[in-house]
Curated annotation (Swiss-Prot):
PANTHER family: METHYLTRANSFERASE, RIBOSOMAL RNA LARGE SUBUNIT METHYLTRANSFERASE H
Family: Belongs to the RNA methyltransferase RlmH family.
Gene this protein is translated from: rlmH
Known partners and oligomeric status: Homodimer.
Function statement: Specifically methylates the pseudouridine at position 1915 (m3Psi1915) in 23S rRNA.
Organism name: Shewanella sp. (strain MR-7)
Binding positions for S-adenosyl-L-methionine per the UniProt entry: 73, 104, 123-128
Record's GO cellular component terms: cytoplasm
E.C. no: 2.1.1.177
Cystine crosslinks: none
Name of the protein this chain belongs to: Ribosomal RNA large subunit methyltransferase H
One Pfam family named in its UniProt record: SPOUT_MTase
Enzyme class: transferase
Length: 156
């Protein structure tokens, strides 16, 4: 199974890139984690946020291979514990489809992305900076993988 993290924003600080890559490289080849960056629309004083969100959403959806299971990261989503995420990941594997996880920009996800989603995951009730979300998602997915594979990384 392939995991895709599709996130709005490019040119992240080095610490974000290093943090994400640290967890990305830990995954085995049969569970690859890929990052796809979508350029953020220009936001200024007179920016048309609705149009920006729509365009970002179109680009995100275009990046998803046909047949992928789509999971949005969104506040109204389900709060998963590590064991619940591990169970979800196991179901995704048994389903035989690759998974695309969508992270929006400062205003969140486009309505079209939310409508296309098969599941929605609330990473935290806290407001997290979008660059940090990439690392937290990568670590959480790796931890869930480690639970499913009896790897010593996760301890209860």
């Amino acid at each position: 199974m392939k995991l895709q993290l599709i996130a709005v924003g490019t040119r992240m600080p080095d610490w974000v890139t290093r943090g994400f890559e640290e967890y990305q490289r830990r995954f085995p080849r049969d569970m690859a984690l890929e990052l796809i960056e979508i350029p953020a629309g220009k936001r200024g004083k007179n920016a048309d946020i609705v149009r920006i969100l729509q365009k970002e959403g179109e680009q995100m959806l275009a990046a998803i291979p046909k047949g992928n299971h789509i999971v949005t990261l969104d506040l109204p989503g389900k709060n998963w514990t590590t064991p619940e995420l591990a169970t979800a990941m196991n179901k995704w594997q048994l389903d035989g489809r690759d998974v695309s996880l969508l992270v929006g920009g400062p205003e969140g996800l486009a309505p079209a992305c939310k409508e296309a989603a098969h599941q929605s995951w609330c990473l935290s009730a806290l407001t997290l900076p979008h660059p940090l979300v990439r690392i937290v998602v990568a670590e959480s997915l790796y931890r869930a993988w480690s639970v499913n594979n009896n790897h010593p990384y996760h301890r209860e």
